Each structure stands twice: as structure tokens, then as C-alpha cells.
């Protein structure tokens, strides 16, 4: 087995590392402070072909594989997890299901919008009473003539107040449980669509999270994604892929924090020598490095399996679980290594710690990942 990246993937990493250093890092702290969506950088990522990069070339994408997308998200998240989150949602949760389940007409219309058209995508599943138990959603879509009439609301929607295209899940038959859920492609300009509360969050301040509301929202019949009653299976399969994106984001956060820790501990002198020379510090940093290497192997393995068309549900859950928990542990320990300085905004590590927490929650909590893993072990 060859663990080395291909020449193409190495070039993608180099390109994204340079972009992150030049464009993302200089504004990361300000993005966090102002809670502003990094619009200019997202436009540049569209120009670079990163947004929607796995979309086939015939629809305006780069035709890249899931590993390439994971590498991009990882590199971006080393300096700004918000930017990594925006890309992960667009690529994995909006472009992906349209590519996989869309009709030829839907692909021809929406995929070019989500690539060369610079339209941002989002995924709308979570509701106030339907979080980990996504089957309990109350949003409804009733077929009336040539269109569906959608009513309800979704919460905690990443890209919520900037997105143009949403993959939305709604009940089309309440008597059938999960088999009564259907998926739709909804545009922000459809009559009856509106954006509700903008969430104020612990971290990911540059990632636009909002409630979206459907009040007699008119959705054309041809915007049904897949067939009626298949929405829940579409959502679960899409989340499998999305978890690879969050694993890559988590990995990037941990790697970014570790790099900050190495640099700081080499320069911080206490008791007559750099604190990097103390064995306790060395062991702590060694454990962080070990976790990053293991997390990278899991994440890349899941991405490669997805790209090869293999079953990857368990791999994605393991990658997401391991890297998210490692990111939280690493950033917490890095803040401790920085001491009082780590608690201030003079250094980025407190932001990294705040950003890391959500990775243990969204796209399935750590507890849900353990359920998925054990279920795929035949337990």
C-alpha cells in the first residue's frame, strides 16, 4: 500500500497552503472578531476551482476526487476553521447529493451555478425538535398541482444566510415515518423562503449559521431530489460524505494548533531554558503529533474509499470521531501550554479551541458516531 500522495494531490496541497498563508491567515482573527463572512476569500476559492471541485468538468467543476477536497479543507482549517467549514458544507452537503441523486436536468441547472456561477450551497436537515434524531422533523411539503408547498423551519444551517441553493428535507407523508421524508433542491429566491435568526456561536464566527423558514414556500415539482420517500436515506448517505469534510476540518484545526505550540514552546523560556526542553512538554507535543498522523490516515482512507466507490460509512464515522476529539484535546492542551497568553486573543489558540468544539457536535455527535461504528460492527 502506497501512503504517499500523488503528484496531483501534492500540488493541490501546495496551492492551498500558499493560499491559506497569503489570503486566509492575515484575516482569520478579524473574521473571528467581527463575525463576518469571508466573502472575498470564498469568491477567490470559486475562482481557484475549490468550491465544487468534485463536480465533473462538464458541469463547471474540476472533476477532483474526495481526497483532493479533504486536503483543501484541511489546509484552510489550519488557519481558519470557518473557511474550511464553508467549503466542506458547499462541497460535501450540497454539490454531492445533487451530483449523486439529481436528474440530468437538475445537474445541468444547479451544478454550474454551484461552480462557475459562484452560488453558495447549503444543507437543511436539523430542526428544533429533530437533532440527532433526524427522523422527527416537522417541516412538510405537500404536492399541489405542479409544485410543492413547503412549511416549517430548519435551524443551525451552515451557510444559512449567504447560500443560494439548499438541499432541504421535508415530510411528504407523515404516516410513513422515515419513508415519508423527501429531499428537495430549494433556491433562496423561491416565494415563501426566508432567513430567520442568525446564530451567535461559541466559535466558527466566520461561518454563517442561521435558521431558515418556509412559509407556503413554492417548490417546483421538478425540484424533488430523487424520488418521494427516499429523503432520509439521501440525508444519511450525504452525511457519510460530509463527515469526511468535518474530519479534514478537525485535522486542520489540530495541526494548526500543534504548529503554534511548537513555535511558542521553543521561544518561551522559563527556569532558564525553553519550555520545549521539558520532558512533560515534549511528551504532550508528541501525543499531539501522534494523533494528527493517525487522524490523517483515517481521514484520507475514508476519502479514498469514497472516491473508489467502496462502502465507507464506518470509516467516515471513525475519522470524524477520532479527529474531532483529537482537535478538542489538542487545542485545550495548547492553550494550557501557552499559559495566560493562551487565554488572550493575542494568539490564535483560544480561537482554535472555540472552533474545535463544534466538530464533536455537528454532522453527528461523538455519541452518534459511536452508534454508527458499532452498528457497522454487527453489534
Positions of predicted regions on the chain:
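A short, Trp-centered hydrophobic/proline-enriched beta-strand micro-motif
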Residues: 117-125
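A short core secondary-structure module
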Residues: 147, 151-195
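Alpha-helical interface subdomain recognition
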Residues: 1-89, 101-106, 113-118, 131-134, ...
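Short Gly/Pro-enriched turn/cap motifs at secondary-structure boundaries
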Residues: 114, 129-132, 156-159, 173-175, ...
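Flexible, small-/acidic-enriched active-site or ligand-binding loops
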Residues: 136, 189-220
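Short glycine/proline-enriched turns and hinge-like loops at secondary-structure junctions
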Residues: 64-65, 133-135, 159-164, 177-180, ...
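Short Ser/Thr-interspersed hydrophobic loop/turn segments at strand-loop and sheet-helix junctions
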Residues: 49, 73-77, 170, 186-191, ...
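Conserved hydrophobic/aromatic beta-strand scaffold that supports enzyme active sites
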Residues: 122, 138-140, 147, 165-169, ...
Amino acid at each position: 500500500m502506497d501512503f504517499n500522495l500523488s503528484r496531483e494531490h501534492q500540488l493541490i496541497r501546495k496551492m492551498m497552503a500558499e493560499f491559506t498563508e497569503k489570503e486566509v491567515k492575515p484575516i482569520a482573527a478579524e473574521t473571528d472578531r467581527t463575525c463576518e463572512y469571508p466573502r472575498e476569500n470564498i469568491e477567490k476559492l470559486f475562482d481557484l476551482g475549490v468550491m465544487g471541485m468534485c463536480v465533473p468538468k462538464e458541469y463547471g467543476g474540476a472533476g477532483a476526487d474526495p481526497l483532493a477536497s479533504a486536503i483543501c479543507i484541511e489546509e484552510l482549517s489550519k488557519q481558519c476553521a470557518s473557511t474550511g467549514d464553508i467549503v466542506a458544507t458547499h462541497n460535501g452537503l450540497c454539490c454531492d447529493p445533487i451530483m449523486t441523486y439529481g436528474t440530468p436536468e437538475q445537474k445541468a441547472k444547479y451544478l454550474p451555478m454551484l461552480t462557475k456561477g459562484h452560488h453558495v450551497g447549503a444543507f437543511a436537515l436539523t430542526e428544533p425538535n429533530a437533532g440527532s434524531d433526524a427522523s422527527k422533523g416537522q417541516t412538510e411539503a405537500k404536492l399541489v398541482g405542479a409544485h410543492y408547498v413547503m412549511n416549517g423551519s430548519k435551524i443551525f444551517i451552515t451557510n444559512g444566510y449567504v447560500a443560494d441553493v439548499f438541499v432541504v428535507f421535508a415530510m411528504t407523508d407523515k404516516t410513513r415515518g422515515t419513508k415519508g421524508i423527501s429531499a428537495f433542491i430549494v433556491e433562496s429566491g423561491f416565494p415563501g423562503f426566508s432567513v430567520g435568526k442568525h446564530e451567535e456561536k461559541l466559535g466558527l464566527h466566520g461561518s454563517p449559521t442561521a435558521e431558515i423558514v418556509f412559509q407556503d414556500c413554492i417548490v417546483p415539482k421538478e425540484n424533488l431530489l430523487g424520488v418521494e420517500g427516499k429523503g432520509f436515506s439521501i440525508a444519511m448517505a450525504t452525511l457519510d460524505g460530509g463527515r469526511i469534510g468535518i474530519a479534514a476540518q478537525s485535522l486542520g484545526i489540530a495541526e494548526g494548533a500543534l504548529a503554534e505550540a511548537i513555535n511558542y514552546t521553543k521561544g518561551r523560556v522559563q527556569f532558564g531554558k525553553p519550555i520545549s526542553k521539558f520532558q512533560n512538554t515534549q511528551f504532550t507535543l508528541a501525543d499531539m503529533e501522534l494523533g494528527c498522523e493517525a487522524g490523517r490516515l483515517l481521514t484520507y482512507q475514508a476519502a479514498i474509499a469514497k472516491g473508489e466507490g467502496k462502502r465507507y460509512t464506518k470509516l467516515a464515522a471513525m475519522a470524524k470521531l477520532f479527529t474531532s476529539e483529537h482537535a478538542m484535546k489538542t487545542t485545550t492542551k495548547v492553550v494550557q501550554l501557552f499559559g495566560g497568553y493562551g487565554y488572550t486573543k493575542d494568539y490564535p489558540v483560544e480561537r482554535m479551541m472555540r472552533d474545535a468544539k463544534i466538530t464533536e457536535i455537528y454532522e453527528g455527535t461523538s455519541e452518534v458516531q459511536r452508534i454508527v461504528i458499532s452498528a457497522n460492527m454487527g453489534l
